[in-house]
Amino acid sequence: KYLRHLLLLHPYTVVIYDELEASEAVRWDWLLHSPTQFQPDKDRNMSVTENTTKGFKTVVRQFSNSSFEYSQTDQFVVPPATPAPAQWHLTATYGPCAQNRILTIIQITPDSEQAPAIVRTGDSFQCDDWSIQAVLSPSQPAELIVTNRTNSALFSYSADNPVIDGSMYLRKSPRSSLLYDQSNGRYGVTEQTDYIPASTRAVDYEHKTNP
């Protein structure tokens, strides 16, 4: 099982929440790619890459109850058939476990600005005006709730029904992903259930056999 929720938080923050489950303890590799080299900092669970040509830098921070190690290479796993620009590939390798949760917060800022600090209290993360609550223990039901302290924006992936503008909003589907945000000057709710990405729908891992 794998589920990924990905959010873009205005103006420059990307949030990725991964739920990973296997039938036995396995190694998990989380990959990120960049045209410029990464500068990993294991003590702070972060990595930085800077594109001086285009004038921006990217700070990647990862949080999990499982320990991991960073590595990187500028080689493709499968060499391209035709010449391609050099790329850097960062891998966060998590030790063997049957279940894992990973919260990744990516901040992309101009070179002239400093990425806001992320303050963690348990499973709560404050990032500038955004409050992120992400359950990282696989023994607890998965949950991702994001709110903003300057407006009414809300994202809720949870078993509970959220409170929107002082009233309880009843989900149409259990554990749906619910977004309350402004569009064309008006706030509204968008609700969606999880689905399997098109790139993996044709793979039946349960019944797949080796040739």
Positions of PLM-derived features:
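CBM-like, beta-strand-rich accessory domains located in the C-terminal region of large
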Residues: 1-210
